[in-house]
Amino acid sequence: MAQRIFTLILLLCSTSVFAGLFDAPGRSQFVPADQAFTFDFQQNQHDLNLTWQIKDGYYLYRKQIRITPEHAKIADVQLPQGVWHEDEFYGKSEIYRDRLTLPVTINQASAGATLTVTYQGCADAGFCYPPETKTVPLSEVVANNAAPQPVSVPQQEQPTAQLPFSALWALLIGIGIAFTPCVLPMYPLISGIVLGGKQRLSTARALLLTFIYVQGMALTYTALGLVVAAAGLQFQAALQHPYVLIGLAIVFTLLAMSMFGLFTLQLPSSLQTRLTLMSNRQQGGSPGGVFVMGAIAGLICSPCTTAPLSAILLYIAQSGNMWLGGGTLYLYALGMGLPLMLITVFGNRLLPKSGPWMEQVKTAFGFVILALPVFLLERVIGDIWGLRLWSALGVAFFGGAFITSLQAKRGWMRVVQIILLAAALVSVRPLQDWAFGATHTAQTQTHLNFTQIKTVDELNQALVEAKGKPVMLDLYADWCVACKEFEKYTFSDPQVQKALADTVLLQANVTANDAQDVALLKHLNVLGLPTILFFDGQGQEHPQARVTGFMDAETFSAHLRDRQP
């Protein structure tokens, strides 16, 4: 009886399910690409459907899907919108989860025509697969003289671009714009017009009329926000193109320059005059007339409000979110209207005295607008150059504010000057590192010294030349996020470097995924990246020491102590 029980225990422990319970971290728990992304197709004359069944915990990159016809003509393929995914190294990318159905219209296909489909995906656990290529055989299709009908693409979950600033900032910006030289002096006049020249209104009545005026103005701005966000939703893919991002960055920079006084940006004077006449025809003191006056006022942009309004409109177009677009502009208008409501109720005694400080407020908003092109360019030029741009902007803002504050004579301004100077010195650090090469030197000192190999023959030769030393082979690719995490966080750790001091370090860069790369991965039986292999002094791999997926420095150091031959 005891022998039977012992045999049963051995049988259970030998199965893959129970054996998986004893796998150490880093052992492969990932399925092959064909199981992670099950690909299928179905053709019915001119209509071809490509489908991917995506395993839970995995995703496909939208930008990595490519379709190339051979001896066939197809209509333009419109990829459905995905969901946003963000990582430290590549920023935001659109991805597909669960299931993707892609309809393709075949305009004409000769006998033997094919469709080459390339795609690539990753696992949430930080494991990426090389690009997969499938060949789809096409049935013969005779060209149809009629114009092909546009392909109806099923929409997946709408992506919402994550913007770096909350919509609530629009409220603060609106309040700040109210204190610029083009707006603040006009509030007493506007208050009188809204009340219809009546001085003996109750506080509640005056507040109600002013609130209605602000809501009319807010309605105009909200409508603008909805229209721009809807347009951004239609052109969301185009708005993420590097050339478009660079163009928008230039526009934002020009808008900021107008806030610095380099030129004046406003509606044509003839249009402003016409809108003003329409507003003057309305009857002040009545709710209906006041509402129309506010709605028209939202269209009359002064030189101080045109640039911020244009910047906010272009900014929310990046989101493609109509709720965010309308809400942002509503809060912006509400912020501009709050000082007007206070003046109407409490009178001019709440207004600060006009002076040069209003120009400084206008200049400060120019720097706020300048932050937007930096945010956009960061997606194109990468994190390192993005940090340098933020550094330059910080130095310009805090340095300029410090120089301006030197004109102040009040004692408490000395504390402000010290804070501004300290902020400028902190901001300049990335530029200092770049100028004097500090960052490069540090990186050079912390990187492992890998010997690059490309082919199976080069690997075998390197194993022979190791002369009895243990060997570690790191398989790397630019499209592998976890590979970059290994490089930045794990291989730079002093404990890891010390543990690998007597190990021959090899690295194969398979970014190109060419025939040699594919042959090497197949020879090593590698499903995807990151994968790190360990060989003993005789050139034999230790499969139990193989690492798939990211390990931090502490875990990897423990793995080296326990597993490395």
UniProtKB/Swiss-Prot annotation:
Instruction: Say where the protein is mainly found.
Output: membrane
Bridged cysteine pairs (disulfide): C122-C128, C182-C304, C480-C483
Q: Which Gene3D superfamilies match?
A: Glutaredoxin, Thiol:disulfide interchange protein DsbD, N-terminal domain
**A GO molecular function held by the record:** protein-disulfide reductase [NAD(P)H] activity
> Which part of the chain is the Thioredoxin domain?
434-565
Group of enzyme by EC: oxidoreductase
Identify the stretch annotated as signal peptide in this record: 1-19
Give the EC number(s) under which this enzyme is classified: 1.8.1.8
Membrane topology note = Multi-pass membrane protein
Residue stretches spanning the membrane: 163-183, 208-228, 243-263, 296-316, 323-343, 365-385, 386-406
Q: Which InterPro entries match?
A: Cyt_c_assmbl_TM_dom, DsbD_gamma, DsbDN, DsbDN_sf, Thiol_diS_interchange_DbsD, Thioredoxin-like_fold, Thioredoxin-like_sf, Thioredoxin_CS
Q: Which UniProt keywords apply?
A: Cell inner membrane, Cell membrane, Cytochrome c-type biogenesis, Disulfide bond, Electron transport, Membrane, NAD, Oxidoreductase, Redox-active center, Signal, Transmembrane, Transmembrane helix, Transport
Q: Which reaction is this enzyme known to catalyze?
A: [protein]-dithiol + NAD(+) = [protein]-disulfide + NADH + H(+); [protein]-dithiol + NADP(+) = [protein]-disulfide + NADPH + H(+)
Localization (cell): Cell inner membrane
Q: Which Pfam families match?
A: DsbD_N, DsbD_TM, Thioredoxin_2
Superkingdom field? Bacteria
List the record's Gene Ontology CC terms alphabetically: plasma membrane
Its GO biological process annotations read: cell redox homeostasis; cytochrome complex assembly
Checking NCBIfam families in the record gives:
PRK00293.1
- Please name the PANTHER family in this protein's record: THIOL:DISULFIDE INTERCHANGE PROTEIN DSBD
Function, as annotated, reads: Required to facilitate the formation of correct disulfide bonds in some periplasmic proteins and for the assembly of the periplasmic c-type cytochromes. Acts by transferring electrons from cytoplasmic thioredoxin to the periplasm. This transfer involves a cascade of disulfide bond formation and reduction steps.
Give the family from UniProt: Belongs to the thioredoxin family. DsbD subfamily.
**Name of the protein this chain belongs to:** Thiol:disulfide interchange protein DsbD
Q: What is the lineage of its organism?
A: Bacteria, Pseudomonadati, Pseudomonadota, Gammaproteobacteria, Enterobacterales
